Amino acid sequence: MATVNQLVRKPRAPKVDKTNVPALNACPQKRGVCTRVYTTTPKKPNSALRKVARVRLTNGFEVTSYIGGEGHNLQEHSVILIRGGRVKDLPGVRYHTIRGALDCAGVTSRRQSRSKYGAKRPKS
């Protein structure tokens, strides 16, 4: 326990919690331009070609964003919206591309979890 004199000389410092998504600047989403769209391989023990994009955000950050869903239409200079959320088996990927927003098309022929992939309701 600190004495009153110690607290007068050096007050208690508030705890600083570290964010997992620093590039978002406490915003829910950020817009950015794709600088590179490519595939990468996950960590062991998984095996795949995961689709990712290198994105230059409006605040100047350059981040790697995962492109979820089957198939995509992204290429260099596409304008996309990103959200937080890491991909556990891809080191350094802390953001997700939002499907169905800006230049990123939704997943066609998606029947379930449509809202997560920007898919319209199918004509029954």
Swiss-Prot record:
Listed SUPFAM superfamilies: Nucleic acid-binding proteins
One of the GO biological process terms: translation
Disulfides per UniProt: none
3-methylthioaspartic acid: modified positions: 89
Keywords: Methylation, Ribonucleoprotein, Ribosomal protein, RNA-binding, rRNA-binding, tRNA-binding
Pfam families, A to Z: Ribosom_S12_S23 (PF00164)
The keyword Membrane belongs to this UniProt entry's keyword annotation: no
GO molecular function: rRNA binding; structural constituent of ribosome; tRNA binding
A GO cellular component annotation in the UniProt record: small ribosomal subunit
Keyword match Cell wall biogenesis/degradation: no
Family, as annotated: Belongs to the universal ribosomal protein uS12 family.
Subunit structure: Part of the 30S ribosomal subunit. Contacts proteins S8 and S17. May interact with IF1 in the 30S initiation complex.
Protein role: With S4 and S5 plays an important role in translational accuracy. Interacts with and stabilizes bases of the 16S rRNA that are involved in tRNA selection in the A site and with the mRNA backbone. Located at the interface of the 30S and 50S subunits, it traverses the body of the 30S subunit contacting proteins on the other side and probably holding the rRNA structure together. The combined cluster of proteins S8, S12 and S17 appears to hold together the shoulder and platform of the 30S subunit.
Protein name (database record): Small ribosomal subunit protein uS12
Organism: Shewanella baltica (strain OS185)
Source species taxonomy: Bacteria, Pseudomonadati, Pseudomonadota, Gammaproteobacteria, Alteromonadales
Gene: rpsL
